[in-house]
Amino acid sequence: MSMPATSTKTTKLATSLIDEYALLGWRAMLTEVNLSPKPGLVDRINCGAHKDMALEDFHRSALAIQGWLPRFIEFGACSAEMAPEAVLNGLRPIGMACEGDMFRATAGVNTHKGSIFSLGLLCAAIGRLLQLNQPVTPTTVCSTAASFCRGLTDRELRTNNSQRTAGQRLYQQLGLTGARGEAEAGYPLVINHALPHYLTLLDQGLDPELALLDTLLLLMATNGDTNVASRGGEGGLRWLQREAQTLLNNGGIRTPADLDYLRQFDRECIERNLSPGGSADLLILTWFLAQI
């Protein structure tokens, strides 16, 4: 499939640098899906609350998406002189083409649609910052991504029409803004909570997988996850948030023995058909930003 043109302007970025960030995006997706055990999510142990996807689907999907991440970076660089609010429209065709390759790789299974949106935004932000010779840090990347999304929630969630999307219904019923709201706000759950939490645990010498699992619990406890709400309504979301917070209050995931609590949580999520996919997407961003 031919890739959409990025821009008429050229980029001065080295291909090796672009590929380095794209590789980090791929590794972030693999790190998340291979992390086990994760409540309600596909991992190395089981398929969580999903009957239509397996671990291998995520591996194929991540590989397909990796090939597109350089395009997001390149577009971010080539559009560096554009007003940030104008960038998102240019990213959409790249995202849709990437999504098409994901669906081809998985025979129609939606494994990483949320990550295409969020990683695409962050990669474009990185390209813009590099092109402008500005520092690439978690904070600058997320604030730049936020500038691309200014007004997105108003435009896409508060619009009233006869054929409301799932996101519009959840916003109007529960006030949840989902991936759009988190992006427009500059990923505060990641920047202010998950990322510092994860880095602190690593600094304390905790095993990286345990640290990431504990960080997932933090995200599950604080995120208004539209994936959960679409499956279990407000009651399902509040239950999942309470259970995750209870585990954190009881000490979180600090030793291999604590994994038993996650396995039980996983069984309960499967019984309730709840999958915190939005929190998984934010965990991908957390790991990705921790590397830059």
From Swiss-Prot:
It comes from the Bacteria. It catalyses: 3'-dephospho-CoA + ATP = 2'-(5''-triphospho-alpha-D-ribosyl)-3'-dephospho-CoA + adenine. One of its GO terms (biological process) is prosthetic group biosynthetic process. Gene3D superfamilies: Triphosphoribosyl-dephospho-CoA protein (1.10.4200.10). Its EC number is 2.4.2.52. Disulfide bonds: none annotated. Keywords: ATP-binding, Nucleotide-binding, Transferase. Catalyzes the formation of 2-(5''-triphosphoribosyl)-3'-dephosphocoenzyme-A, the precursor of the prosthetic group of the holo-acyl carrier protein (gamma chain) of citrate lyase, from ATP and dephospho-CoA. Belongs to the CitG/MdcB family. This is 2-(5''-triphosphoribosyl)-3'-dephosphocoenzyme-A synthase. It comes from Escherichia coli O7:K1 (strain IAI39 / ExPEC). The lineage of its organism: Bacteria, Pseudomonadati, Pseudomonadota, Gammaproteobacteria, Enterobacterales. The gene is citG.
